[in-house]
Regions:
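Conserved hydrophobic residues forming the short capping helix/wall of the S-adenosyl-L-methionine
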Residues: 12, 154, 228
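Non-catalytic accessory regions of SAM-dependent methyltransferases
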Residues: 1-35, 41
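Conserved AdoMet
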Residues: 27-105
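Conserved Class I SAM-dependent methyltransferase catalytic core
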Residues: 214-232
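Conserved SAM/SAH cofactor-binding pocket of Class I
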Residues: 95-196, 223
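Proline-centered flexible-loop/turn and helix-kink motifs
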Residues: 14-17, 133, 159, 206
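Mobile active-site "lid"/loop adjacent to the S-adenosyl-L-methionine
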Residues: 188-220
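A general structural signal for well-ordered alpha-helical segments in protein cores
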Residues: 5, 25-26, 56, 69, ...
Length: 232
């Protein structure tokens, strides 16, 4: 195991560093060898098959180009579940789970109708569905391609979420219902800030889910606020 870790450390240290590099190496080793974290830390001797060696080199090459490991493996963890991801959807972030936790804490004894606007991978809606089984959860996105990913994640995680296509900036098109809660993780990064971000984000994650015009950075928040006044 130590040789494998050293190989990954040497190959990736120019692209990643610190805790991120440590986490990437641990994930690769555990997933490739089919072991848990405890076994990984024992660092027992392992021998890769020829097929595993070829796969490992392919992963290294893609990581060195800046492609996120989550896209390479096609999956990402969120709220104790696994979600399918590809470059059409944002990779779920741990900080987004704090939003889920807050809603669950505030509405644990209620039966709200919740709409996730710009659902992406569906991670927020699906996590809410699992943790608030008494709630009615719906989710929308402007992209049919994105909704395909979200629906697959709902199927995999056995979450009863209803999905539909909708552009949250199109305030002239009414939503199908009134909602008790509108939740969203909308784009908010100014386009001019892209130059200061890592290539793992700017070259691979969907810009439509990240960036807003410099001269109208709050466009999505303004639309959500207006929807909250007219539809919720």
């Amino acid at each position: 195991m130590k040789q494998l870790i050293d190989k990954l450390q040497t190959a990736l240290s120019g692209t990643y560093e610190g805790h991120e590099l440590t986490a990437i190496i641990r994930t690769i080793c555990c997933d490739m060898l089919g072991i848990d974290t405890a076994t990984y830390y024992l660092k027992e001797a392992v021998t890769l098959t020829t097929e595993q060696g070829t796969l490992l080199q392919g992963i290294i090459d893609r990581l060195r180009q800046g492609e996120p490991l989550q896209y390479i493996e096609g999956k990402a963890p969120f709220c104790g579940m696994e979600f399918a991801v590809n470059s059409s959807v944002l990779i779920p972030r741990p900080e987004t789970a704090e939003l889920v936790d807050w809603i669950v804490c505030e509405h644990a004894t209620q039966q709200p109708r919740i709409l996730d606007l710009g659902t992406g991978s569906g991670c927020i809606a699906i996590a809410l569905s699992k943790q608030l089984p008494q709630a009615t959860i719906e989710a929308c996105d402007i992209s049919a391609e994105v909704l395909t990913v979200a629906k697959e994640n709902a199927r995999m995680n056995e979450a009863p979420v209803s999905f539909f296509t909708h552009d949250m900036l199109d305030l002239g098109t009414p939503l199908p219902h009134s909602y008790d809660i509108l939740v969203s993780n909308p784009p908010y990064i100014r386009q001019s800030e892209a130059a200061d971000m890592s290539i793992q984000v700017t070259e691979w994650e969907p810009h439509t889910a990240l960036f807003v015009p410099d001269d109208d950075a709050l466009c999505f928040y303004r639309a959500i606020a207006e929807l909250g006044q007219t539809e919720a």
